[in-house]
Design a protein with these regions (language model features):
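PDZ/PDZ-like domain segments forming the peptide/carboxylate-binding groove
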Residues: 2-52, 113-118
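Solvent-exposed loop/turn segments at secondary-structure junctions
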Residues: 12-13, 29-31, 43, 49-51, ...
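Loop/turn elements at helix/coil->beta-strand transitions in domains of secreted/extracellular proteins
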Residues: 39-41, 73-77, 101-104, 129-134, ...
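Extracytoplasmic/secreted envelope proteins and their assembly/folding machinery
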Residues: 20, 116-123, 149-153, 219, ...
Length: 254
């Protein structure tokens, strides 16, 4: 994808049209990181113009951009050229010791099929190092591929539920549409399962997550108003099987 390698949230500024972009994430190795942009920076201008409701949507489409960044006491110009790069959605994974327990932290930003191998690797590490509780940070995750959240769920759910292929999610539609889906061969149910097949860029891949089931007893989910779709689905699907505490704002509801 052609990108500057950062994400942001929009906030209304002084006038009815004026906006401020607040940097929420800067991808490692991106033009944004190389230009010195950091999480929490306030962006108030784009190409010598204030950012407004009329022009903020231009930013992702521009091949180059000059951003005006507001600091505590001054402003500085940040220049960037967009590049084609993979934005790794596994932003951060780490392990902490708390009250004689090991707690894993996974900041996951998009259910992207290209991230499956890294997700499996991270979950294997959590398992091997004895992680018993997990903080899953989905605050900026607006969704993605349904098979990928099924794969992650199969590494988070209790191992016995995965071994039984318990129902993870069930789609409910009117009878006509359900029949149409059946004729297309699209299942109405997704199961917890140790082996999954995904199609990535036209190629089929088989993933085995049986050695990557972490065995956690509790999941803490960090959410926000940007948390949507697949991010909401994984929390709904895991609730019957896992103790989940949701922390944050009301999710988008997509």
């Amino acid at each position: 994808v052609t990108t500057y390698g950062f994400e942001y949230a929009l906030y209304q500024a002084g006038s009815s049209k004026q906006l401020v972009l607040v940097t929420t994430l800067v991808y490692p190795g991106s033009p944004a990181e190389k230009a010195g942009l950091k999480r929490g920076n306030l962006i108030v201008g784009l190409n010598n113009e204030p950012i407004t409701t009329d022009n903020y949507q231009q930013l992702p489409t521009l091949a180059s951009a000059e951003l005006m960044v507001q600091t505590h006491s001054s402003q500085k110009v940040v220049k960037m050229q967009a590049v084609s790069m993979y934005e790794d959605p596994v932003v951060l994974d780490s392990i902490y010791r708390w009250e004689n327990k090991k707690v894993g932290y996974l900041f996951y930003n998009k259910f992207n099929p290209l991230s499956c191998e890294k997700l499996i690797s991270v979950c294997k590490r959590f398992k091997n190092e004895g992680v018993s509780e997990l903080i899953l940070d989905l605050r900026y995750n607006s969704g993605g591929n349904s098979k990928v959240h099924q794969l992650l769920a199969s590494m988070l759910a209790p191992e016995e539920n995965v071994a039984r292929n318990d129902v993870y999610l069930k789609r409910v539609h009117n009878k006509d549409y359900e029949e149409e889906l059946r004729q297309k061969g699209e299942p109405l149910e997704q199961l917890l399962q140790p082996q999954l097949e995904l199609t990535i860029e036209g190629n089929k891949y088989d993933y085995d997550v049986s050695d990557a089931n972490i065995g956690i007893t509790k999941l803490y989910a960090l959410v926000s108003g940007k948390t949507a779709s697949a991010s909401e689905a994984i929390l709904i699907g895991l609730r019957p099987y896992l103790d989940i505490e949701i922390i944050g704002e009301t999710t988008r509801g997509k």
